[in-house]
Structures are given as C-alpha cells and as structure tokens.
Amino acid sequence: MAERNTAEELDDVYEIKYSTDAMTGGADKRMYLYYQLANSIKKADSVDIIVSFLMESGVKMLLGELDNALKRGAKIRILTGNYLGITQPSALYLIKHKLGEQVDLRFYNEKNRSFHPKSYMFHYKDYSELYIGSSNISRSALTSGIEWNYRFSNKTDPINYEKFYNTFVDLFENHSIVIDDEELKKYSKNWHRPAVSKDLDRYDLQDDKEISNQIPLFEPRGAQIEALCALENTRAEGARRALVQAATGVGKTYLAAFDSKNYERVLFVAHREEILKQAAESFKNVRDSDDYGFFNGDSKCTEKSVIFASVATLGRVDYLNENYFEPDYFTYVVIDEFHHAVNEQYQRIVDYFK
C-alpha cells in the first residue's frame, strides 16, 4: 500500500499565517509546530536540526520546504539518534533520496550518554532563532500531539542562544558519525521495529484520520522508499534489470508503480487476472491516469501507456511479434512473481522485450 502526504493536505485545508513563540499542539492548528517551522525554513540561509529520532511521517512533512531551501542555496545540518532503533531507516533513505548529499546528515555517536535533544535552529542574514522543546520529527509531534516548544532569538536571549548553539556545533562536529550509504545500509540491515515505534505510528495514523477526508495522494512508505533508492542507484551504475525480493505486505505492486512513474510505456505481466486487475488499480492511483489497458483473453489493447498482460496470452508466439509490440516498445517492464519465469511463456516474454 501507500499513504498520502499530510503536509500537502494541511496546506490545502488550513493556511496558517498566525505567528507564535509558544507551540503546544492540540486541536488548535495555530499551535502546530509544523507551520512555524515551515515559515522559518522558507526564510533561512541555513538550518540546523538536532532531534533524538526521525520518523518517515515527519520527514515527509518537511521535505518540500527543505528541498526549496536547498535550491536557493541554504545549508542544512541534521543530527539524530540511533538508540533503540526509533529512527526509521525509511526516514533516512527519504532524506538521502530526495535531498541528496547536500544535507549533512549524522548520527550521534556516543554510546555511554543518552541523547534526547529536540531543537531547530534557523540562521538569517541579521539574526538567528532557536526552537526548543519536546518535538522530534514525526507527524503527530509536528501537528496535533501535545508537545511544548518555545522559540527565541539570539537578539532576545543571546547568552542562552550561544550555549545551545555551541553545544550543537560540538556534538555535530566531535560526537557524530556521517550517515553515508554504507552506514545507512548497516543501520537498515540491523534495524528491528521497536515496540515504542508502533505507538508512535498509531498516533500518526490517528492524527491522519483527524486531518481530512481528502482524496489520497499516494506516496511510497517504509521499505518501499529503501527499495526505490536501491533501484535508482542500480540504474545509475548502468544496470537495466533488477530483482526485488520483499516480504508479504511491503506492497511490491505499489513499489513497481512508484518506480515506473518516470517511464512513458509500461508493461506489467502476471499469471492471474486477479493480480492484473489489482495492479491496474495500484498503477492508476500512483500515476493518476486512466491511460491503461489489458492484453488478455478478452482484450488485446496495444495503444495505452500502461499494459497489463496475462502471461498465458502475451506469451504466445502469435502475439510476441511486431504486429502487436516492437521488442523495444516498452520502456519499463514488470514481471510479477518472477520465480515463475522458468515457465516457457514467461521466458519467451523476457527474451522478446530486450
């Protein structure tokens, strides 16, 4: 499955222009930390974030503003924790995938000291400001969760601002490890979803239900994000084929739909009609298009952008020829349940579409 982008929904249903230095969450949207952070990111020349954990739901909310900040030349540093595995690998992959190496992303790396700070620092041309309080980066913590956060500047309280900022710099430069590709793979491989993470996810889901009855905006989630990053890296290295092996429930069909979004002509091959129909619905949701058709016993559609084909039909010699499809017609091909490819018809399809 996939999920919707709550930040976009919030912007649609409630445009906030209210400014406050004390943010407490709850039912009053004016008290959401998210709105104040978003406004600060939009103006900042550089951004420093230190939180004990990152969750995918919160990262998704801030990605748009952070991306725009990078495009105008802002510097971004993020220091987070890896204790107890509360930081989700998908949140880190999302930052790396969407924002690239422009963000200096690090883990706190002292094993004998706890790490529970939550602070957001923004530096402008003439001054700096600092948010400090209880909110890590999760959807509920940025919106309706009961969180207490306070904002002040280096003009209103220069002494304490310098204490906090200098401590951040020391932790970032002297007590951290860079989250490069190798470190991220290691963290992801050893990661097990902690029990407390389930509670945090539940809060996010409840917050999501309260926000809107909007039409879902489908986005990758969890292991899908990690897989998409791996597929993109594989293509960057010159590979033209990839095998995705994932547990039941990951949402492999949605994953294929997300990965196909930048390709004009897509072929999805499966051995059962039920799978083809379900896949068509998933691709329709992700690509937001009705430009798809079926190639099976009842239909021989050849003119749509996305074709869902039965292996029993397409795999016949009668149809694997230029009267139906040129060998290079499709720019993206998905073979569902590839372990069936030992079947002669599957192999014929794979060999034909080079």
Protein language model features and the residues they cover:
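PLD/PLD-like phosphodiesterase catalytic module centered on the HKD motif
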Residues: M1-R221, I225, C229, H339
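Hydrophobic positions in the central parallel beta-sheet of the AAA+
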Residues: I49, L130, I307-A309, V333
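Conserved RecA-like ASCE P-loop NTPase motor core of nucleic-acid helicases/translocases
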Residues: S52, A256, R265-R272
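Hydrophobic residues on the short alpha-helix immediately C-terminal to a glycine-rich phosphate/catalytic loop
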Residues: E65, L231, L255-N262, I349
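Walker A/P-loop
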Residues: R235-D259
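Conserved helix-turn-beta segment of the N-terminal RecA-like "Helicase ATP-binding" lobe
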Residues: V266, E273-S299
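Conserved two-lobed SF2 helicase motor
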Residues: E303-Y319
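SF2 helicase catalytic motif II
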Residues: A312, N323-K354
